[in-house]
A protein has these predicted regions:
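Hydrophobic cores of alpha-helical transmembrane segments in multi-pass integral membrane proteins
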Residues: 1-10, 24-49, 59-88, 97-156
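Juxtamembrane membrane-water interface segments that cap and precede transmembrane helices
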Residues: 13-23
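Membrane-interface segments at loop-to-transmembrane junctions
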Residues: 18-20, 55-62
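Hydrophobic alpha-helical bundle architecture
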Residues: 93-95
Length: 156
């Protein structure tokens, strides 16, 4: 009963946002971000472990394992967003700040895939420190772009 006054203020979604691709695109990207957040927490935990190499190895293995589905989901999410953009606006990519930062985030998280050829990633502590810092790209993509840069992803 208390919310009936607010219901009249809710406006319908813009037609471009009524695509079924929207929910799949957003859900896929959010699942990737959740896995990246889990890697952030694993990284913080790994840096707190003192003198227990067995635990550190297990945490590192879990973080590296989670990297694959996280990057895969982000890639699929970006691809679905590009398809949706083509259907809605007639082009796949417009270098919108959100698109650009999503691509930057993808590249940042793809770097650890080359851990055998990048010396610093051979040390678990360095790997986890990188994963903690990498989450900054997710924060910028999710929050920073909306509040600082605007673009096509600002629907307010």
């Amino acid at each position: 009963a208390m919310m009936t006054g607010n219901v009249s203020q809710i406006s319908p979604l813009m037609p471009v946002l009524q695509s079924p691709l929207l929910s799949v695109h957003v859900m896929t990207v959010m699942c990737a971000y959740a896995l990246f957040a889990l890697q952030l927490l694993l990284g913080i935990y790994a840096l707190m472990i003192k003198g227990n190499n067995y635990s550190l190895d297990k945490v590192t293995a879990l973080s590296q394992f989670l990297l694959y589905p996280a990057v895969f989901l982000l890639t699929i999410g970006i691809f679905l967003g590009a398809v949706w953009a083509n259907v809605s606006w007639g082009n796949y990519w417009s270098w919108d700040p959100k698109e650009t930062w999503a691509l930057i985030t993808l590249m940042v998280y793809a770097v650890p895939f080359h851990s055998t050829s990048i010396f610093m990633f051979r040390k678990p502590q360095c790997y986890h420190l990188y994963m903690i810092c990498a989450f900054l790209s997710v924060v910028i993509t999710y929050f920073g772009v909306n509040y600082l840069l605007g673009g096509m992803h600002s629907y307010a």
